[in-house]
Amino acid sequence: MDRGAVVGFLLGVCVVSCLAGTPKTSWRRVSVGEDVSLLPAPGPTGRGPTQKLLWAVEPLDGCGPLHPSWXSLMPPKQVPETVVDAACMRAPVPLAMAYAPPAPSATGGLRTDFVWQERAAVVNRSLVIYGVRETDSGLYTLSVGDIKDPARQVASVVLVVQPAPVPTPPPTPADYDEDDNDEGEGEDESLAGTPASGTPRLPPPPAPPRSWPSAPEVSHVRGVTVRMETPEAILFSPGEAFSTNVSIHAIAHDDQTYTMDVVWLRFDVPTSCAEMRIYESCLYHPQLPECLSPADAPCAASTWTSRLAVRSYAGCSRTNPPPRCSAEAHMEPVPGLAWQAASVNLEFRDASPQHSGLYLCVVYVNDHIHAWGHITISTAAXYRNAVVEQPLPQRGADLAEPTHPHVGAPPHAPPTHGALRLGAVMGAALLLSVLGLSVWACMTCWRRRAWRAVKSRASGKGPTYIRVADSELYADWSSDSEGERDQVPWLAPPERPDSPSTNGSGFEILSPTAPSVYPRSDGHQSRRQLTTFGSGRPDRRYSQASDSSVFW
């Protein structure tokens, strides 16, 4: 068998074993330099004549001291667990593989075991590590499978390698006390059991190995925990039918109801990109300037404008978890794409290169991201790797005029409807303000002029000129008798002259002959001559005495 194929097979089995559950987990502490035997293989199950045994390890030497504690992840059941930071863990490493009973090889011999570590061996169907070191601390797993069936993980053990205890030095002559004989004579009988003179004083017994203090129980009492498993890539040939293999498990730790949204996003993968970068910080803060305009925009998955598909669950709780709670699904109309039954997976029918892209599956619980994963779906020829970046992307330069004559500037985004409406409202308000100010100024000026005219007339200072008709409207009122004036028919229209005036405007101006037109004196009113001019016949004069009340 080709060694590369064997290594690839073992790595695949190791990954599968790490993702699978661990039905049996134990803890073991050893000291540096010991020979350790781990994970004995179970007996034959009768499912096949030959079994594959795979031992692997996930190094935990960079995670600091570890100790188990009772955790209530699924109340009321309690299991021993430990909290390990994912940043300190390394990829699983295969240690050894064996066949039980030995299987025939392609060369005619028997395939027994393969070992990839110098200090590891398979002895009596168990993994043996000679002279363990502190760097050997980790999670060791055993996976068992038949020749034609995938391996399944059956046992695991957490191995913690502690420093070796300091050996006790043998006693030396300096440890003997020369004065023990003299002091022993006067001692009380109660000390008769003490060592006699000349006996070396033994050092105190070594302290027992330090035991890790029992940690308090770890229990999640509130919130929801979401666990997601997604394949990182799916390769297809045009015309095939396949579906995404996404597994989502939600565990509620209290009796509160919650809503869960499973959102699918899609990003195009340009052929000019060597790889796609997923900026995890932008998933939680998509409106940051760095996420809106990253420097590597064509090859970055930082922000999105639309959702490909959404399946929402409402009214979920600990006793009614998804998918049993009320569900509602929406999907953009894409040919050849549909939901896989009532699950959260996508189903591709008659797949084509247009379906290729980077797909993100994001789980929201009460509008907050709780888990997410990505899948690269493409043909083998157009496959591009996806890398997850923790920091924010570099911010791209602002859009500016092109510096090269043959390179066009990217088109500016059209203004939004909200900006247009805001501009129209502001313009209308400004125009109405200008019109209102103009009307107010005109009214103010007109009122001031009218007030000045009324005030000058009412003051009685200086002459006042009025316009009257040029006809003899008051010919019958020239009598000095007050009684005659009382008999004048006021409501009768005045008699118009026989021949209208042709030299004037039809009106006459009364010119006063004294500083005051109607001077007053005690007991009587004086009469003054009024001269008309500018109309009718210039040789005609009318002498008229009247009270000032005639004009005002």
Curated annotation (Swiss-Prot):
**What is the species of this protein?**
Human herpesvirus 1 (strain F) (HHV-1)
Similarity field = Belongs to the alphaherpesvirinae glycoprotein E family.
Residue positions of motif Internalization motif: 465-468, 474-477
- Glycosylation: which residues? 124, 245
State the residue spans of region: Acidic: 478-486
Report whether Transmembrane shows up as a keyword of the record: yes
Which protein is depicted? Envelope glycoprotein E
Q: Which residues lie on this side of the membrane: Intravirion?
A: 443-552
One Gene Ontology term of the biological-process aspect is: symbiont-mediated perturbation of host cell-cell junction
